[in-house]
Amino acid sequence: MKKNRAFNQVKKTKFDGRIKTSAKHQLRNVKTGVKDGVFIYKGPLTVSEFASKTNIAVANIIKHFFLNGLALTVNSVLTNEQLADACVNFGFDFKMETEVTHENIVANIQFEDSDDLLQPRPPIVTIMGHVDHGKTSLLDTIRKTNVTAKEFGGITQKIGAYQVKNHQNKTITFIDTPGHEAFTLMRARGAKVTDIVVLVVAADDGIKKQTEEAISHAKSANTPIIVFINKMDKPTANPDLVIQQLNKFDLVPEAWGGKTIFVMGSALTGQGINELLDNILLLGEVEGYQANYNAHSSGYAIEVQTSKGLGPIANVIVKRGTLKLGDIVVLGPAYGRVRTMHDENGNSLKQATPSKPVQISGFDIMPVAGEKFIVFDDEKDAKLIANKFKEQQKQKANNLTVNQTLKEQIKNKEIKILNLIFKADSDGSLQAIKQAVENINVAKISLSIIHAAVGQISESDIMLAKASGALLFSLNLGLSQTVKNIASLQGVKLEVHYHIPKLAEEIENILKGQLDPVYEEIEIGKAEVLQLWFHSKIGNIAGTIVKSGKIKRGNLCKLFRDKEIIFEGRIDSLKNEKTPVNLIETGKNCGIVINGCNDIKIGDIIVAYEKQIVKDGKL
């Protein structure tokens, strides 16, 4: 990819890639509009936005594309190619400018450390696994074996991570926010913090849902895994069964001819703890984790909060360089000089070296967890970068959807592997879609199912999709509005499908670079919820009266409460009295079951609708 001038200037600065004053001008927003007969733009715009920037009537723009076989609305997004086509048609020259953003400045500052400047740093470890398998107990036991009772009881603040030493006095950093949600949230923001994942599995319980999720998340991040089989003190412990279960995830112990480190032990008794620490350090040496200790510092925020007396504070892990008191730090929308620095025991520090977790204060506003921090020489430059972050947060709602961006990338051959995540109502549905995906064959692009499980889509699934750039599909299960809102906020493409062949066809069309068909929602009928029943096998049954139109079994539907959408799904069952029916007309009472909907109340409105294809599109 061709780098713009601002990147070159950032890279050429003498000390650690700090930003020169001349680069400030490159950081200013490129203004979209017509200048001297040239339409300057930064990226895709809606028809309405293009019209307002060029003073061309919306109707004329829509007419132009309609005559060329493309039906658009005022809110349709014009691609870069379509904008160029419109400019030519309406008599403008055009020029696309690349805007320098907070993300690409932070991500692309190049640190060219020669090998002689690098020194080993402690490995950074996250513990993951199923709930109740002993993640927290393991962390506590490791912590207790490395501090005195007085120190352990006297911790003054929780900073999200801590360091321990093994019997050879070698250091390991543990992130003590166990769970794959925190792990993936960091990765979704581009943060490569964790070096090694310790996967905890209970010897008396085996592989569970969250175990599988944790494996998917770690493998998706290409993070090495060490398996700790916990609860070996239990009389029902069966480590061989656990090992057999893990084989299907390509986690095979070295003793069985594999490459994965397995440690047997007990967080309760302390069995295997020293062996685990030694193996973490051994793997760290093999992987060769290094950093330049003498450089300006950078790293990641694992937690942020407000402290009485200190204001906004951030719990950070240093990944490069040495962070010092008085350093000017940028962290997301916040910047400031490091005013105080403490370790996990509340000890005041003057500096922090690579892999060291510390709590720092001195920010002007609240930072953002998961973002990268960087030290700058010039406070004005720091303020400029922080302000850039704020501006982009405001503009986020106007950005391209993930789906359209994905298709642009596929068209431009920037994506060679498309990641997929499936959640389904049953294992049978999962097996069916897996088989369907295996049969999809598009030249030069491959499909990778990075996670598939039975159950509703969770926030964890959304964060994994964001972190891995995956498409997320729900099979035969509706979505709550909360989940949809989270997906929208994170920019994740999320779809519900009730027909596996159609889903497979859509995935194939995406790979071929086709746009989704343009659909129009046609309201079929509307019903008001008057009563509620609960059936142990069916779930919630809504007693309704059809207010308008007709309701059909199998209709897509939306559940409204106070004019807000609460749930979207499908009508699975209709009953008149106790008789199953396929259709209910206006004025009649009926019992309605909405697939996957658990939140329904008297007074809610159910709107049944159908989707009709208006027009197919192509990139």
Curated annotation (Swiss-Prot):
Which keywords does this Swiss-Prot/TrEMBL entry list?
A: Cytoplasm, GTP-binding, Initiation factor, Nucleotide-binding, Protein biosynthesis
SUPFAM superfamilies recorded: Initiation factor IF2/eIF5b, domain 3 (SSF52156), P-loop containing nucleoside triphosphate hydrolases (SSF52540), Translation proteins (SSF50447)
Q: Matching CDD domains, A to Z?
A: IF2_eIF5B (cd01887), IF2_mtIF2_II (cd03702), mtIF2_IVc (cd03692)
Principal localization?
Answer: cytoplasm
At which positions is GTP bound?
Answer: 129-136, 176-180, 230-233
What is the purpose of this protein? One of the essential components for the initiation of protein synthesis. Protects formylmethionyl-tRNA from spontaneous hydrolysis and promotes its binding to the 30S ribosomal subunits. Also involved in the hydrolysis of GTP during the formation of the 70S ribosomal complex.
Region (G3) residue spans: 176-179
Q: Which Gene Ontology cellular-component terms appear in the entry?
A: cytoplasm; cytosol
Q: What family, per the record?
A: Belongs to the TRAFAC class translation factor GTPase superfamily. Classic translation factor GTPase family. IF-2 subfamily.
- One biological process GO term for this chain? translational initiation
Q: Where is this region: G5?
A: 266-268
Name the InterPro entries for this protein.
Answer: EF-G-like_DII, IF2_II, P-loop_NTPase, Small_GTP-bd, T_Tr_GTP-bd_dom, TF_IF2_bacterial-like, TIF_IF2, TIF_IF2_dom3
UniProt protein name: Translation initiation factor IF-2
Gene of this entry: infB
Annotated Gene Ontology MF terms? GTP binding; GTPase activity; translation initiation factor activity
Residue span of region G2: 154-158
Report the locations given in the UniProt record: Cytoplasm
tr-type G domain location, by residue? 120-289
Q: Where is this region: G4?
A: 230-233
Segments for region (G1): 129-136
